[in-house]
């Protein structure tokens, strides 16, 4: 289900709308966010493909899969930066990675971060799909707040060889 979760008036005419997609109803929630920065196109592409797959599972088109739990997806978090073709939206110059938990009354990027944070706060799992910097070789990896059996099982299921624990500060 596609749902508009935020609409911000802009100085350029049409409002900036933030959408989320949701599949499933109950169980642990997985939140997936992509498009935090305008130059991270790979994450948006992966999120789009995943959305198509989840649609086919929920609609029963692919009977080999069932959805256990709930998935929430923000495929395009920072549309202004994407439309400008740059990492940041030049109008406010804020890095969305650093804007969380956001401020609903703040700059546009802060308001977007606040809405995403609010709609993903109850998630057990959270993925941010992004790209490595240009000319940088990177392997798929997982950053986690804690290492436990569920994280180890997730890495095994996704065939991710590297999981790093984030130091809480």
Where are the regions that the model predicts?
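Structured catalytic-domain cores with a bias toward divalent-metal coordination
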Residues: 1-169
């Amino acid at each position: 289900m596609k749902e508009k979760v935020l609409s911000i008036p802009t100085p350029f005419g049409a409002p900036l709308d933030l959408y989320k997609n949701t599949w499933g109803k109950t169980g642990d929630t997985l939140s997936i966010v992509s498009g935090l920065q305008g130059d991270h196109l790979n994450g948006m592409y992966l999120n789009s493909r995943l959305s198509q797959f989840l649609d086919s599972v929920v609609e029963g088109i692919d009977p080999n899969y069932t959805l256990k739990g709930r998935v929430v997806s923000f495929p395009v978090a920072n549309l202004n930066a994407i439309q400008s073709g740059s990492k940041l939206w030049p109008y406010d110059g804020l890095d969305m990675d650093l804007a969380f938990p956001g401020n609903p009354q703040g700059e546009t990027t802060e308001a977007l971060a606040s809405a995403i944070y609010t709609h993903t706060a109850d998630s057990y799992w959270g993925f941010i799909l992004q790209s490595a910097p240009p000319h940088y070789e990177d392997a798929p990896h997982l950053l986690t707040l804690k290492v436990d059996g569920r994280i180890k099982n997730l890495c095994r299921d996704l065939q991710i060889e590297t999981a790093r624990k984030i130091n809480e500060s």
